[in-house]
Amino acid sequence: MTNHPANGLDDVVHQRVRLGILTIAHEARRVEFGYLRTNLDLTAGNQSQHLTVLDNAGLISIEKGYEGKRARTWVSLTPAGNTALRDEIAQLKRLINQIDRNDKRRKREQPT
């Protein structure tokens, strides 16, 4: 018996906000905290919790510094984060393919 594709989804990556953070971080070398917060419609506290989960899992790196006199926090995808994101996408594609196959099978089985 084969495993259902849903079993391959990573709970750390798959959560909506964390998947969004990883996806946006994949688009740029590094992304600023405020940009993530605005684009994912998050509170600073909620975003910080998700960043901590991803950082603890080794999927992102967090860099704090200054831009002029303003404190900034930047997020970057680590190589492990890139692999985890790609693995998650592959599992989602498997899940979609299974749904498509089931839909086609059901259409064939419908009485005419």
Explain the meaning of each model-derived region.
Residues 14, 46-48, 90, 109:
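Intrinsically disordered, low-complexity regions enriched in polar/acidic and amide residues
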Residues 1-6, 23, 82-112:
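Amphipathic alpha-helical dimerization/coiled-coil segments
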Residues 58:
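Glycine-centered, phosphate/nucleic-acid-interacting loop/turn motifs that mediate DNA/RNA or nucleotide
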Residues 77-81:
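Accessory beta->alpha helical hairpin/"wing" motif in late/C-terminal subdomains of nucleic-acid enzymes
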